[in-house]
A protein has these predicted regions:
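Catalytic and substrate-binding regions of extracellular carbohydrate-active enzymes
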Residues: 3-215
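Short, intrinsically disordered, charge-balanced linker/junction segments flanking boundaries
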Residues: 218-223
Length: 223
């Protein structure tokens, strides 16, 4: 019997996949970087995807909600992948190095010190309307602060990412919003410009803070 191929339309738009309960429970007892979840299980998620469609030119984004596990990275609330035209434009920066700076993520330093990121991310909002969508996710109690990442998305047109950090503890805070491009990157007028022919990507900083480009060491032919 032959079946006609059909696109999985239920994966188009905004989709949040649930975090398996054993993964949640293992955070506090696992062998590596034990951290008790600080968000109720019902508010967690595993992955959050934004998919415009199944054509090659359609854009796709994947955000991580889980920052532990066996082969783990501290990438909760980080954008793992952004692709358009069938090509990756934002990606993980390292296979081995797992700290937030190697991801499209937020680094929070308080009084000159860093802490391990929380294990799970809270899903506050994930809504798809007729022509646009909105998501809101929060990493709670991250080195004395809550970090909320809001994304406003018009499929195949633009993506607005707003990061808000709310201090819960008094201290001297330093914030680094990191982006990990795939391709030839440059900085102009506080914007990250990426060329990965035939695609181009502009990550524009609308708040005016200065930007800089750092070249990290190569590992396994990763840029």
């Amino acid at each position: 019997m032959w079946l006609e191929p059909r696109e999985p339309r239920d994966q188009v738009g905004i989709v949040a996949s649930p975090l398996p309960r054993p993964n949640y429970d293992d955070c506090a007892v696992g062998a590596q970087y034990r951290t008790a979840p600080n968000v109720p299980y019902e508010l967690t998620f595993n992955k959050l995807s934004l998919r415009a469609g199944w054509d090659r030119d359609d854009e796709y984004l994947l955000l991580d909600g889980f920052g532990r596990g066996n082969h783990m990275h501290f990438d909760a609330n980080a954008i793992l992948r952004y692709a358009r035209g069938g090509l990756p434009l934002l990606c993980d920066g390292e296979y081995i190095k797992n700290s937030p700076k190697y991801h499209s993520s937020m680094v929070i330093i308080r009084d000159g010190q860093a802490e391990l990121t929380p294990a799970v991310t809270r899903l506050d909002r994930a809504e798809m309307l007729t022509s646009a969508g909105c998501t809101q996710t929060t990493l709670t109690q991250y080195n004395g602060a809550d970090w909320t990442r809001t994304m406003l998305w018009r499929p195949n047109a633009y993506l607005l990412v707003a990061d808000e950090v709310k201090a819960l503890t008094t201290g001297d805070y330093a914030l680094r919003c990191c982006w990990r491009p795939w391709g030839e990157a440059s900085v102009r007028d506080n914007s990250l410009l990426l060329s990965s022919p035939p695609m181009r990507l502009a990550v524009c900083n609308v708040t005016g803070e200065p930007a800089r480009l750092e070249n990290l060491k190569q590992s396994g032919n990763m840029p």
